[in-house]
Curated annotation (Swiss-Prot):
Lineage per the UniProt record: Eukaryota, Metazoa, Ecdysozoa, Arthropoda, Hexapoda
One GO biological process term: protein O-linked mannosylation
Pfam family, one: TPR_7
GO CC terms, sorted: endoplasmic reticulum membrane
UniProt source species: Drosophila melanogaster (Fruit fly)
Its biological purpose: Transfers mannosyl residues to the hydroxyl group of serine or threonine residues.
Protein name: Protein O-mannosyl-transferase Tmtc1
GO molecular function: dolichyl-phosphate-mannose-protein mannosyltransferase activity; mannosyltransferase activity
Membrane-spanning parts: 23-43, 104-124, 135-154, 155-174, 190-210, 246-266, 289-309, 329-349, 423-443, 447-467, 474-493
Family: Belongs to the TMTC family.
Matching SUPFAM superfamilies: TPR-like
Superkingdom as given in the UniProt entry: Eukaryota
Segments in the Cytoplasmic topological domain: 1-22, 125-134, 175-189, 267-288, 350-422, 468-473
């Protein structure tokens, strides 16, 4: 007699055609809806996290991914954000290697990750929800929800996308492990959870979710193979030892992960500003408590009705709750009451199914009855046991593939789904809620990406329940479908339009003016200034200061607007106010110093300001890279000032100080400092040290021709090393054949050797490479004059005049060549034009005197 073998339930059960269609439809919907993000650029935080991040561009070693935060700042730095996401930064680095700084590749990866996440949400819903329509509703809602726009359209949201994918995969892997306690699935779960942690720290809660899922799992399923082999003791028993082992491993892994993150890795002493999280700086305990209790409600409100969305919810975007009579406290009470009700209902259903799940007992016992009764197993169907639970025919399909309409199947699904749906909503959000510890923001839409999985599961659970309750009325089901279609349509349109806001910074900042005016207007003013729209920028920045007079960035940006319009007297007070409000703002010192220089009579004050800015340590500054860049430029400006005043020793000292004070400076900028120091030392005739500094510059930037040119110029000052100097000029040309300055400086060297014909060829090549460069065009004319090719020289001098018609020396040079050619009248006109532009122009006066022409003579 043949006895059928019992099949073990598996998460890899074959999907039905309807499931495959729903899965493909949800993923396709997610892809199509975000297609309009593929032509977007780098906006807002993308610039700092990608464009200015040396960990992404390869400017730093790969090992630095483990030592630096998400923004490229060392974790030990006082200004570090503390966000450690090496896998996400690694993905950006791979994007850079594949396509450089072309944004299309970055956006495509984000869209594909969202499609994968939608796919996985569908599969997760399929393990929890009793109705296929509920699963479809959950997957479709996740695909179109507008709250996901920041995570998908904003490139820094990749941390949330990738962590969500790993989080859901870890959950699905552990569901498989729960069926038969295989070690492979458990190890895979742990690896996926740790990968999620390496994408974003909040995803470590995946291990908590897996443990909760195990605790809520029904009894009896994993031992069905023993029953099939005739072990009656496995009928209702559950192997608590194996479950305890799995839970212990999860707990140990969670503790190890937390220990490694909090103890082994550096923890920055970051002090978030009041603008980032004003409630955290509130002195009143009750205001802090009531506001932080309300923030999860506000976040849930975005999930419920995502009409008002903003790139930033800091400052006063969410006003603090200062009294018990604030109406928002009612919403807070209702929200937490609803959570308790869901958990209470779930625990009640759980109790009703304990200690024995009779549907599971039936599925386990009927194969045993078949062995006892042979082929007459059907005679056992419909029997009722002593506990009055009727036995039914067994199903050998995976529970994850069944959408049963029986009351027991519904009860089993309803037992876990509300609790696990709530867990998906709450657990990943807790670390960012400000309830456990303060974080550097009030609200952030991309933080909701993973918690929204729980929201979509609960929505799908409710929709599926309604769908099953009206199964006898096609009109009611049609109304449900219309309602679902309307909701998805409204969300889809909102998502599509919100994607357009994320295409460029101007539109993004304009979209948030009504929610966070000072932040949005301040950033918008900076964008308008960069576009050269100075009047709009000034108006916008003054509106910003009307909302928040103590905003240092707004004062600084307003100063930049005045500076770009050459209105230095108005720019200086703005920079001074920015420094007063934020003393560590090095770039404000830099701009203040350059503005003072431009006024002409404040050189000593400018030197003092630049020296102060260059020596700022920048304790607690958020953007360490920008701070170091500003200090570096302050040192360079300081050396230029000293050099122009003839204080070469002071200039060299400033550059030496910069090399010691800025150890984190990128190699390219360190090379510039060595190069400048070498030039100054050469002027001081310290040849050996000058040569040493220039060799250091070449070692740091071997692909930069400028270092070779400067080294060649230094060697050329030594008459015994002319051949060696020329070899370095030739190397520079080989390295950068399209660099005009390489040809220009080599030509200078050849002219010093009176090799004028060779020099002319290089002059012509340099001028062809930079046809709008006045100096290079003038040098061609000079080279032709030295070869006595005066007619050709005249043409080049005339071209130079067209490039700089307001430059007195350009007209004087043209006058000189005309004078040499005997064109006296035209030459005098050129000299007069030069004197008109610069009344004290010495060369024009001298040449007119040689021609016996008075200044106002008109021949």
């Amino acid at each position: 007699m043949h006895t059928p073998k019992c099949r073990r339930p598996s998460m890899s059960a074959t999907l039905s055609h309807k499931d495959l269609a729903g899965l493909a439809g949800c993923s396709a919907l997610a892809f199509v809806l975000y297609l309009n993000t593929l032509n977007a650029g780098f906006v807002y935080d993308d610039r700092r996290a990608i464009l200015a991040n040396g960990d992404v561009t390869g400017a730093r070693p790969l090992a630095n991914l483990l030592r630096n935060d998400f923004w490229g700042t060392p974790l030990v730095d006082s200004g570090s954000h503390g966000s450690w996401r090496p896998l996400c930064v690694l993905s950006f680095r791979l994007n850079y290697l594949a396509g450089g700084m072309t944004p299309l590749g970055y956006h495509l990866v984000n869209v594909m990750l969202h499609c994968v996440a939608t796919w996985l949400v569908f599969l997760v819903a399929r393990t929890l929800l009793p109705s296929r329509m509920g699963v479809l509703a959950a997957g479709a809602l996740f695909a179109v929800h507008p709250a996901h726009t920041e995570a998908v359209a904003g490139l820094v949201g990749r941390a949330d996308l990738a962590s969500c994918v790993c989080y859901l995969l870890a959950y699905l892997s552990y569901r498989r492990h729960m069926l038969n306690r295989e070690w492979g699935s458990l190890i895979l779960t742990i690896m996926l959870a740790l990968a999620a942690l390496l994408c974003k720290e909040t995803a470590i809660t995946a291990l908590l979710l897996c443990g909760l899922c195990d605790v809520l799992s029904p009894v009896g399923r994993e031992n069905s193979d023993k029953v099939c082999d005739g072990s009656i003791s496995g009928l209702a028993s559950f192997n608590f030892q194996r479950r305890f082992r799995s839970l212990s491993i999860l707990g140990f892994t969670l503790l190890c992960g937390l220990y490694c993150r909090l103890s082994l890795l550096p923890r920055p002493s970051t002090a978030f500003s009041a603008a980032d999280n004003p409630t955290a700086h509130e002195s009143c305990f009750w205001t802090r408590t009531l506001t932080f209790l309300y923030l999860p409600v506000a976040n849930f409100g975005i999930l419920l009705w995502p009409q008002e969305l903003s790139f930033d919810w800091g400052m006063e975007a969410v006003s603090r709750i200062r009294t018990l009579w604030d109406a928002r406290n009612i919403l807070t009470a209702g929200f937490y009451g609803s959570l308790v009700a869901i958990l209470w209902k779930g625990s009640g259903l759980r109790s009703a199914a304990s200690p024995m799940d009779f549907a599971e007992v039936a599925n386990i016992s009927l194969p045993l009855l078949r062995r006892l009764g042979g082929n007459s197993c059907h005679t056992w169907l419909g029997l009722t046991c002593d506990c009055h639970h009727q036995l039914s025919a067994p199903s050998y399909r995976s529970a994850s593939a069944i959408y049963s309409t029986s009351s027991k199947s519904k009860s089993a699904s309803w037992t876990a789904a509300p609790i696990l749906g709530t867990a998906f909503l709450v657990l990943p959000f807790l670390p960012a809620s400000n309830l456990l510890f303060y974080v550097g923001f009030v609200m952030a839409e991309r933080v909701l990406y993973l918690p929204s999985v729980g929201y979509c599961l609960l929505f799908g659970l409710g929709f599926g329940h309604l769908w099953q309750r009206v199964n006898s009325s096609w009109r009611s089901r049609l109304m449900l479908l219309c309602g679902l279609a309307l909701l998805l349509g409204v969300h889809g349109v909102r998502t599509f339009r919100r994607n357009l806001d994320w295409r460029d910074e101007e539109q993004l900042f304009r979209s948030a003016i009504s929610i966070n005016p000072p932040k949005a207007l301040g950033n918008l003013g900076s964008v308008l200034s960069a576009q050269g729209r100075y009047e709009e920028a000034e108006l916008t920045l003054r509106m910003t200061l009307g909302h928040r007079p103590t905003m240092a960035d707004a004062h600084f940006n307003l100063g930049v607007v005045h500076q770009k319009q050459l209105n230095f007297s108005s720019a200086i007070p703005c920079f001074r106010r920015a420094i007063e409000l934020r003393p560590q703002l090095a770039v404000a010192y830099l701009n203040l110093g350059t503005s003072l220089i431009s006024l002409g009579d404040h050189r000593q004050e400018a030197i003092s300001v630049l020296r102060t800015g260059a020596r700022l340590e920048g304790s607690g500054v958020r953007d360490r890279g920008a701070h170091v860049e500003a200090r570096y430029t302050c040192y360079l400006q300081l050396s230029v000032l000293y050099r122009s005043d003839g204080r070469l020793q002071d200039a060299a000292a400033a550059l030496r100080e910069s090399l010691k004070a800025l150890p984190l400076l990128p190699q390219k900028q360190r090379a510039v400092l060595h190069l400048r120091l070498g030039e100054i030392l050469a002027e001081l005739q310290d040849w050996n040290e000058a040569e040493h500094q220039q060799r250091l510059a070449m070692q740091l930037q071997p692909e930069q021709g400028a270092a070779y040119v400067t080294y060649g110029q230094t060697l050329a000052r030594n008459g015994s090393r002319l051949a060696e100097a020329e070899s370095w000029f030739k190397r520079a040309l080989q390295l950068a054949p399209l660099e005009p300055s390489s040809h220009h400086h080599y030509a200078d060297f050849l002219e010093q050797q009176e090799r004028h014909h060779e020099a002319l060829g290089l002059r012509l090549r340099a001028a062809a490479l930079a046809p709008q460069d006045y100096t290079l065009q003038s040098c061609v004319a000079d080279a032709l004059r030295l070869l006595n090719r005066l007619a050709e020289a005249e043409l080049w001098y005339r071209k130079a005049v067209t490039l700089q018609p307001m430059a007195a020396h350009a007209h004087a040079n043209l006058g000189a060549i005309l004078q040499m050619r005997g064109l006296r009248k035209e030459a005098v006109a050129c000299y007069h034009k030069a004197l008109e532009l610069q009344p004290g122009h010495a060369i024009s006066r001298a040449n007119l005197a040689r021609m016996n022409v008075h200044k106002h003579e008109n021949e």
